[in-house]
Each structure stands twice: as structure tokens, then as C-alpha cells.
């Protein structure tokens, strides 16, 4: 039996759900009662990351069920409109609704190339294109098709996008620019959907202890500077359950700010802002190659 909670009876679709923030979000939404449709490109017969065991959709669904929730998984490349439309039509045929969309797909680091030199103009041209496709474009495709087929006709729903607050001064040019495109898309969609009862919110976590980060970064580097991806997942579950979620629409909101607002702690009881023993994640580097979020 699925978990009972504030999202019972709701269906959430989470892209990029095979690992990291996507997996944690699927688990937290399911723990709050939602039926979760998990999508990504990585399966046990074709994993895109092998540095850590079972970073796959099947592994995510196992974690969802271990948390007392339920759902299903489907392999989908969210840069391909035909695949996304087929996915959504199948979900609607089986369940009749999509209440929450979490845009977490991110493929740009799969094409990571080191610059040949140290100057900004030495950056490979392909890098920015790959990040735009894996980030803002996949968000655009998935959101518009979800609006067209499900949320628009229902005049209800919530679109959540995982992103990054680009720093000042800016760092890695293709990464910062592609994240800025994601953020502006949220602002533009929020503006155009504000009178239709559909919220669009970007959620910006800090430096997360994902599976790949813990496998590649020394524990002493992570200590005191990081949060688990479950903190952002819990925040997104709270947003999905909030009847006044439209207060955040069109905005990029820091996970720490939302955790304070909803009084949510991380798995270890910490929170990015607030009382003694809590931390503020800084500085934050770009994700590891192949990492989502």
C-alpha cells in the first residue's frame, strides 16, 4: 500500500530520476503520498553512470517503494519531443492526470570537454549547446507538452525546476549561461501562467552530497559545506502540498529559504540557515561530470 500523506491521490512526474537530486525527489514525493513516475535515460541494461552501483531508474523505484511509496519508471530522453509526448500520453491513458512536474533532467555534463587553454574563448563550442539541450531545452519541451496535454486542460498543476543560483562574478561560462536560460524560462512561464492556476517555481539547492559527489570528493571537503539531495526533495514535496504555492511562481528560490519557510530539516537534522549546528553551503562548484541538477 502506498504511503499516505499530503500528496495522496496526486501524480508527480520526475525527470532525471535515476540518481542524485532526481532520485531523492522521487523518494520524498512518494513518502508524502504521491504516485511517482520516474524518467531518465539510465536503466540496468543501459546505465549512463557506472562509478556507483545501480544509478538507474529501477534502483530509484526500489528506493521509492522502500520509503513506502509507489510509482513506475520509463526510459525517456527529454530532449526528444516524440519520446516525451509518448511518455505523457501513456501516463494520461493509465492515470488520467499529471499534477506535479519536476524538471530535473540535465545532460550537458555527459559531453564535458576540457578547454584547450585558459582563456574564455578556448571553451569548446559543443559544451554550451549540450548544456542548453540537456537543461533549458528539455525543460521547455517537457513543460510545454505537460501543459498542452494535462495541466492546461485541467487548469491546475505545479511545475518545479531544479536549477542553480548563478554566482557573482560568474564562473564557468557555458554552465552559468545555460542555468540562466533555465531560470529565465521559469520566470517567463510563471508570468504567462499566473492567471491559469498553474505554478512554476525554480528550486536552487546548495552543494549536494549526491552519490557521485560522495564517490569522488574527500569527506573532509564535504563536511560542513553540503546538504543531502533529500533536503531539496523535501522542499519540493512541501511546495507541491502548499495550497498557496502561487506565492512563489515565476521565481528562483533557494532551498535554504524554502526550508526555513516550511520548517524542513535535512536527513541529519541540519538546515542551511538558522539555529546552531546548521550550515550555509558555500562555496559551491559546478556538479561532477554526468551529475544532474
Write out the residue ranges for each language-model feature.
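Short-chain dehydrogenase/reductase
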Residues: 1-95, 107-119, 126, 290
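Active-site loop of short-chain dehydrogenase/reductase
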Residues: 10, 69-70, 97-98, 150-163, ...
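Conserved Rossmann-fold SDR core element
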Residues: 29, 97, 183, 193-208, ...
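A glycine/serine/threonine-rich, flexible loop-to-helix segment
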Residues: 48-53, 116, 195, 205-227, ...
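Hydrophobic structural elements of the Rossmann-like NAD(P)H-binding subdomain
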Residues: 102, 160, 200-203, 213
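Catalytic loop of short-chain dehydrogenase/reductase
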Residues: 107-111, 119-131, 139-140, 148, ...
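C-terminal helical subdomain
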Residues: 202, 219-293
